[in-house]
Amino acid sequence: MKDGLYAKFNTTKGEIIVALEYKKTPGTVGNFVSLAEGNLENEIKPQGTPYYNGLKFHRVIPDFMIQGGCPKGTGSGGPGYQFDDEFHPDLKHNAPGILSMANAGPGTNGSQFFITHIATPWLDNKHTVFGKVIEGQDIVDAIVQNDSLVSLEIIRVGKEAEA
């Protein structure tokens, strides 16, 4: 792996590895990584407990996307806080495998995310893109509703990613 920050999604269907855009969307990536590692205070899980482990992919629309990160498993849950969108001109929904924040409108990001099956340009500047699948798009495409995210591991490669 090149220097960078990565998320390894260990699912019931296999592994997905995503390169995280920590330089272009530092707030969004920081939130995601902190929840994944259990370092961010939230209303759902005690600090020190990885937030995403065991959650389901609660919404799957074939030929569109898979969505996860809801602690209720319904799409209505979150960590108990919201944060602003973080758009970057270089990050678009222009290909399969884009990792983006799910939300209910501007400034309503929390813990829910989705990964695309196809390019979805109509989502640009509505949902924060913060990563791209580099391995396992076949797994993304194989996931069905209620498959589980067994664990989410953050991988740091190089000095900048470890900072």
Regions flagged by a language model, labelled:
Residues 1-163:
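Cyclophilin-like peptidyl-prolyl cis-trans isomerases
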